[in-house]
Amino acid sequence: MAVDTDLERRVLDLERILEVTRAIGSTVDLDELLGRIAAAATAVLDCERATVFLLDPERSELSSRVATGMADSPIHEIRFPVGRGIAGEVAATGRNVNISDPYNDPRFNPDFDRQSGFRTTSLLTLPLRGHDGGIVGVIQALNKRGGPFTSRDEVLLATLSAQAGVAVARQTLLEAAALQQRMRRDLEVARAIQQGLLPKHPPDLAGWDVAGWTQPADETGGDCYDWLQVPDGRLMIVIGDATGHGIGPALVSAEARALLRGTATQNQDLPRIVPHVNDLLGEDLREGTFVTAFIGFLDATEGMLDFTSAGHGPILSFSSASGTVTEHATHGTPLGMFPGMTYDPPSRVVLLPGDMLLLFTDGFYEWASPDGTQFGQDRLVDVVTRHRDLPAADIIRLVYDAVSVFARGTKQADDCTAVIVKRTTGPA
């Protein structure tokens, strides 16, 4: 009769373990699944309590995720560092601990008992391991009824701990996949917003061909370009490059663009606009973050373009008469780097029919081939010169194509943005 009873108990234990195994395949919620595992441990081991602790590797802490037998306890969460107490030691060493008299073991921490009024008389603690064998938590059973935990109990709890480890590992993968999907959606939204901030159409200027284009290195980039007809009739032209690439720099460049637009609608005086925007950005940006920028105002009738460089360069102009390219000095400090800075008086370039202003960010110049050689300014100038009779947008596309061929498969490391201002005819 006793044999039959023992056999029945073993069969019941196996059924409970199989029930947990089936639940792993059908239950997505981690807390529900761990709760089933803790309940199964309490029943199979015939003990008063079972707790599942999960490891926070960044903080090197264990925290109780689910527990049985604690409905009347004033403590709802237990959190402690790895290495402290029995559970902390198991998390640190990965070794099972089975103690029949915890209060006579120096590793036992009685603080929880004192706070809750509970009395621990025996405990069995095992690590939870993920797919790679790394420790992801600890499962602990307390106070076996009728005596200390046995070696058979240890085997049974090891089976449950393996299932708990699989559940935690699966949930970690699911959460990582969900996070990646959310980030992908967020990046797509951010990219759409950033693209929406770019000019939709070239400016309507008789005798002029103005084109802009950008290709971020990531989903979003720190480069921007813009143009805006201002109240005095001139065309403001901007190209900017915030440090880095990605969402953070994209926000910085968007703020710089908005500040320049807002300021230019009220004031078209470059010596006042640039320091003002520099100061406003300097208040917002953290140290080490800044925007290099070209800000120019084009008088389309006279062909005069006054500009200030806030750290952006090179600034190039192509002369149709001589077939040569001139590089203009760029002395200004990037926007947002040093609030209170003064800037040199604006420079001026006069564009005659066939002449071009060439603005390219460093993503073009610094894109390297597999041997580390950068595309550089000379190659860029050569492409522009050979295709000078084409529309501005086509020239930009051909430059990017040339850089891509030169790179021979190396990944684009920085955002590539360009603006070309080309005078096609003289004044009427």
What are these regions (language model features)?
Residues 121-130, 137:
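A short, aliphatic-rich beta-strand micro-motif
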Residues 131, 148-172, 254-258, 352-353:
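Amphipathic alpha-helical "output/dimerization" segments
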Residues 174, 178-358, 408-428:
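… and, occasionally, acidic/histidine-rich disordered N-termini of signaling adaptors
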Residues 1-26, 30-32, 43:
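Signal-transmission linkers at sensory-effector interfaces
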Residues 39, 49-78, 82, 103-104, ...:
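GAF sensory/regulatory domain recognition
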Residues 1-9, 73, 130-131, 135-136, ...:
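Regulatory loop-to-helix N-cap segments in sensory/regulatory domains
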Residues 61-63, 72-74, 100-122, 143, ...:
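Signal-transducing coupling segments at domain and membrane junctions
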Residues 73-97, 328-331:
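Acidic/proline- and glycine-rich, intrinsically disordered low-complexity segments
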